[in-house]
Amino acid sequence: MLPLSSQCSSFFLPSFLFSPGVAIFGHPGLLVSDSDISRTQKKIKANQDPWTTSWNTLTNLPFSDPSYTPSPASAVYRSTWEDHTANAQLLWHDVAAAFNLGLRWKISRNTSCADAASNILHAWATTLISIDGGDDKYLTAGLQGYELANAAELLRDYQPFVDNVLPSVVEMANNIFIPMHYRWLNHEEPSEHNVLHFFANWELCN
């Protein structure tokens, strides 16, 4: 038998280290799965808390309203940079709204929520050209990029989104977000080598 320390170490190791072959990614993935949605629907139908209270809170947020209007920008700056004013809050708010509306769609099957989320993602995918500025641009690429991907995942079973919007969202991810992740994780940014300036959470974001 393995010593206790080895048993404990094995228990906390990621399961994929022991799994043969390649795991298949299931849609939706990342933060929310179909089993999560199914469980939540049952809890809300049974009027159980905290699910019902949380659902009511979600549906009453201004960032969950199907009438939400996105404000896409061609360039995003997390902080003021040279003669550019910080405007990253536009992306923060819109991506949060896309996720909320996507979640409402998955739980309620209300197509107005799916259309609104799809509209937000389409607006950014057809407008955004760059995430720029200082080093903190990598935080925006990581944090909002991940949230954007989650919003898109929630719409993977909404055919109008899949047919008309998903390709442009994938293109945006491949051309703007993912290259920034690779640049950061590969330590290609000169300032990244200042160990007093950056911490592990920057890499976790990417």
Segments predicted by a language model, with ranges:
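Fungal secretory targeting signals
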Residues: 1-23
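Internal, conserved structured core segments that host functional sites
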Residues: 198-203
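Helical hydrophobic small-molecule/effector-binding pocket
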Residues: 193
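Extracellular glycan-targeting catalytic surfaces
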Residues: 20-189, 197
